[in-house]
């Protein structure tokens, strides 16, 4: 299914998934980067923080961006800074998140992004294993 913008131009694709775990796994596999827009739901924040965590762990090396329109994410960014000041977040991990007040500036910063933080574990050390009888992504799905 494709989403059409008011202009009628196709701007994306809608994927129906069974739960949040599958949603995040699909995004992580297929996205070239992650951008958090202004969100009114906790899921936006949860997904954002998980992608930041996965970057820190070395699960992915993709850019994580915040579209910080009108300072919407200022308190979150200040929270990260406080975490560094208090020793709960390593200084280099702050570089995982790229933020800007406009889409154009955010895209420019994201294109220049190079991971500079130290990973807790190498990307190769992460393996996907089944959790009980829970099906893995793309397993047992009709073609």
UniProtKB/Swiss-Prot annotation:
GO terms for biological process: cytokinin biosynthetic process. Keywords: Cytokinin biosynthesis, Hydrolase. It comes from the Eukaryota. The keyword Magnesium does not apply. One of its GO terms (cellular component) is nucleus. Its EC number is 3.2.2.n1. It holds the Pfam family Lysine_decarbox. Belongs to the LOG family. Cytokinin-activating enzyme working in the direct activation pathway. Phosphoribohydrolase that converts inactive cytokinin nucleotides to the biologically active free-base forms. This is Putative cytokinin riboside 5'-monophosphate phosphoribohydrolase LOG9. It comes from Arabidopsis thaliana (Mouse-ear cress).
């Amino acid at each position: 299914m494709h989403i059409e913008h008011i202009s009628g131009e196709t701007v994306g694709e809608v994927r129906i998934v069974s739960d949040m775990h599958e949603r995040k796994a699909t995004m992580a596999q297929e996205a070239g980067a992650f951008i958090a827009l202004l969100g009114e739901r906790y899921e936006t924040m949860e997904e954002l923080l998980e992608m930041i965590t996965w970057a820190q762990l070395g699960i992915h090396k993709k850019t994580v961006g915040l579209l910080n329109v009108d300072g919407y994410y200022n308190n979150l960014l200040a929270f990260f800074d406080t975490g560094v000041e208090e020793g709960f977040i390593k200084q280099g991990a702050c570089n995982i998140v790229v933020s800007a007040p406009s889409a154009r500036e955010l895209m420019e910063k994201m294109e220049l992004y190079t991971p500079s933080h130290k990973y807790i574990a190498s990307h190769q050390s992460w393996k996907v294993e089944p959790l009980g009888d829970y099906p893995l992504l793309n397993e047992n799905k009709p073609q």
